[in-house]
Regions:
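ATP-binding glycine-rich loop module of kinase domains
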Residues: 11-67
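Active-site beta-strand termini and strand-to-loop segments that position acidic
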Residues: 28-32, 95-96, 141
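Conserved structural core of kinase catalytic domains
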Residues: 58-115
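Protein kinase-like catalytic domain
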Residues: 74, 123-124
Length: 189
């Protein structure tokens, strides 16, 4: 199978909110754009067309989180279909549903607010903070919201400022779906 580097973002100049997209994983699409492969390695080119500025140790730690959560949440109503993953080599292959919501918007998702709330209710039940609810980490499958990218996800009892980072994710990114979501999501924290 042939894989083609996927670079949907050029983060030049610095984005207005100061948050560069795609700083860790290299992303590839297969020939017919039905599968997406993400690799976690120090020498890759990220979706913003630059190498990661993170250390090998940092990338490995984020990969371990990604691997854990895509396997624990595999098959859930909001997860992309997992085709294959290799922990030792640091890659996943999932079904590709099309561009992320930052690119395609949310107009094709009839009840997007309810679906976001359902996902975050699930995450609360599982006692985790996702911490990156960016539209660039969501897509849809014929109106069904798909959330991906779990490398920042941590159990809620992990020491650190994770709750504050989840609030920031709500304020910066999930609020772009609807400002009405903000208090509802924060109530789940």
């Amino acid at each position: 199978m042939n894989w083609h580097l996927y670079i949907p973002y050029k983060n030049t100049p610095r984005p207005a909110d100061g948050h560069y997209l795609g700083q860790i994983a290299s992303v590839y699409l297969n020939d017919d754009q039905t599968l997406i492969k993400r690799t976690y390695n120090l020498n890759g080119v990220t979706v913003n067309d630059s190498p990661s500025e993170y250390s090998a140790e940092f990338i490995k730690e984020r990969w371990a989180r990604e691997y854990r959560w895509i396997n624990e949440f595999n098959g859930e109503f909001f997860m992309p279909e997992l085709i294959d993953a290799n922990y030792d080599e640091g890659w996943t292959v999932q079904k590709y549903y099309g561009p992320d919501l930052l690119i395609q918007g949310t107009s094709q998702i009839p009840n997007v607010e309810d679906q976001v709330l359902d996902i975050y209710k699930f995450l609360k039940e599982k006692e985790v903070y996702k911490k990156n609810g960016s539209l660039s980490n969501m897509t849809h499958d014929n109106g069904r919201l798909i959330a991906f990218d779990y490398k920042w996800t941590v159990p809620r009892d992990t020491p650190g400022d994770h709750k504050e980072l989840e609030e920031r994710s709500i304020d910066l990114w999930l609020s772009k779906i609807s400002l009405d979501l903000v208090p509802k999501l924060k109530a789940l924290l």
